């Protein structure tokens, strides 16, 4: 028995009664419900499935979490079974349907705009829960992206008529379709948007409005090169408002933190970046001075051109000190430092230094339970900083030559 697909013939009808044709268990511990008619749009053509409820007096409202088409009929995924032959009430989530229809009609308008203005063909369309993307076969500039967005929104504001009709596939070559598909056969659904000399016409199985105004707004969120063309991420209507509300809140929070107005955030961040760069430069200079002082001190304390020490510096400074010490061709060093919750080490030697840094790393790893390694010339690693590892380190440093050489 064929299913009457109200989402195609009467898309404004979001609720109806229907007779249960079948209800079979599925592999997801739920049931696939088939009815003789349905207002639910099944996922397809890039558009997400409707969700909603199915109601009967015995079970109340049972959620419909997904719909899909199989063998020409629509199956509704539910968590409870229904008896064959019983009459149920199907109700689509109106807010979700509005959001999805806004995205789909908006996608037609945006794709049409880039086709008319730049001859860019839509070669991919995907609707997710929070964004929509189209893939174009041309890589467009920022200015071209904005021009297409403006063109599409002007079509929305004109409240242009949208006409939906069916034709036989044999008639398709005679129609000014935006996209050609020679594989189609039988009856084909066409969605047409009036646009003067550039009428938008495309094959489509999705839900659409009867005019463009309900799309509300089309906003491009980002675009990037993709394969040989570009991928455009956008949102329409309710979804566009959700994005604006979230991003505006973030902008105002950032502006408040910087003590500026929202339109002054970029300049304020640029000033902060300049300040940070200046402070980083001063820090590098101080670290270099500190490394020089530690290097001189450690070099003086070394025995037989070798030093092992636990230093109160970060790992970058530790590496700099090791490099400075080992500028002496005959010198070797094993230096340790604390960084956050880890104990880190670096072993290094000059060109003629006696320390085998790879072997030293293996010994340190075994003693501290550390992970690391390297070459005979340099090695490094780390382990969690605990009372036990710090005690082990004190034991290593008490007889470094014996423990590391």
Question: What does each of the following model-derived ranges do?
Answer:
Residues 1-405:
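A glycine- and charged-residue-rich anion-binding loop/surface
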């Amino acid at each position: 028995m064929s299913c009457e697909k109200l989402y195609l013939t009467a898309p404004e009808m979001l609720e109806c009664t229907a007779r249960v044709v079948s209800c079979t268990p599925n592999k997801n511990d739920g049931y696939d419900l088939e009815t003789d008619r349905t207002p639910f749009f099944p996922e397809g053509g890039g558009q997400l499935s409707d969700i909603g409820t199915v109601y009967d007096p015995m079970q109340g409202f049972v959620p419909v979490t997904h719909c899909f088409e199989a063998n020409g009929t629509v199956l509704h995924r539910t968590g409870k079974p229904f008896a064959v032959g019983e009459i149920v009430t199907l109700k689509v989530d109106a807010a979700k349907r509005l959001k999805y229809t806004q995205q789909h009609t908006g996608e037609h308008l945006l794709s049409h705009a880039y086709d008319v203005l730049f001859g860019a063909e839509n070669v991919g369309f995907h609707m997710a829960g929070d964004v929509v993307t189209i893939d174009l076969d041309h890589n467009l500039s920022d200015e071209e992206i904005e021009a297409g967005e403006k063109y599409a929104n002007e079509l929305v504001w004109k409240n242009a008529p949208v006409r939906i009709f069916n034709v036989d596939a044999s008639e398709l070559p005679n129609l000014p379709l935006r996209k050609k598909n020679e594989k189609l056969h039988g009856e084909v659904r066409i969605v047409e948007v009036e646009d003067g000399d550039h009428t938008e016409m495309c094959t489509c199985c999705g839900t659409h409005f009867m005019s463009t105004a309900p799309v509300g707004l089309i906003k491009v969120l980002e675009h990037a090169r993709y394969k040989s063309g570009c991928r455009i991420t956008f949102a329409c209507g309710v979804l566009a408002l959700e994005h604006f509300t979230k991003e505006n809140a973030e902008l105002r929070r950032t502006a408040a933190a910087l003590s500026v107005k929202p339109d002054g955030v970029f300049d304020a961040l640029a000033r902060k970046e300049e300040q940070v760069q200046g402070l980083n430069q001063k820090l590098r200079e101080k670290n270099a001075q500190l490394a020089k002082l530690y290097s001189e001190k450690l070099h003086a304390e070394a025995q037989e051109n070798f030093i092992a020490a636990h230093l109160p510096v970060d790992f970058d400074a530790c590496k700099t000190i090791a490099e400075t010490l080992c500028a002496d061709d005959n010198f070797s060093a094993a230096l340790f430092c604390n960084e956050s919750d880890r104990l880190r080490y670096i072993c290094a030697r000059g060109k003629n230094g006696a320390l085998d840094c790879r072997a030293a790393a293996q010994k340190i790893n075994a003693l501290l339970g550390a992970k690391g390694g390297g070459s005979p010339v340099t090695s490094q690693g780390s382990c969690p900083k605990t009372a036990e590892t710090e005690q082990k380190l004190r034991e290593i440093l008490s007889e470094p030559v014996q423990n590391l050489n």
